[in-house]
């Protein structure tokens, strides 16, 4: 924005245009406190270890007081009511576990889910309809993925553990427990 100054003389009017000058000054307020990160209340601490993230983990459920049901939420915000609606509408499973594994270099942000399913026996897969009658979680093989993957009733694809375990070898003594084989170099004559 240009500033215009009008200079009037006795017979004519002249207009001068001067560009505005912008001066940047450092504020003299509390600089140390302003440099700290301040989290708003809507930022979630996913792992409850002071590691705040702006993204909510895909399965985040806020902590509730002991004995408090999802209907008796003390927080009146719409977010908590949305979470309780989500749990009621999606048949929330209390055994549902969720973890992230960032330690493995070869995996791209490995992500795993566990729902209290039993993957140990192949009989569990073939008898999934029988297991559902008994109240157990049913698993079925997906048609489009590998035969080692399973789909639970929640629609999650679970991978079977492909590691082949080596049979355990018998324990042997360590270097400190081994006894050296001494050969008797002195021959004792046998008396006849």
UniProtKB/Swiss-Prot annotation:
Spans annotated as Disordered: 1-53, 65-192
Polar residues: bias regions: 134-148
Sequence ranges of Low complexity compositional bias: 8-18, 69-79
Extent of Basic residues compositional bias:
157-169
Question: Which is a Gene Ontology cellular component entry for this protein?
Answer: nucleus
Which UniProt key words apply to this protein?
A: Nucleus
Location relative to the cell = Nucleus
GO MF term list: protein phosphatase 1 binding; protein serine/threonine phosphatase inhibitor activity
Biased region (Basic and acidic residues) positions are 25-49, 86-103
Give the matching Pfam families. PPI_Ypi1
Its job: Regulator of type 1 phosphatases which maintains protein phosphatase activity under strict control.
Family in the record: Belongs to the YPI1 family.
Name of the featured protein? Type 1 phosphatases regulator YPI2
This protein's species is Scheffersomyces stipitis (strain ATCC 58785 / CBS 6054 / NBRC 10063 / NRRL Y-11545)
Q: Which gene encodes it?
A: YPI2
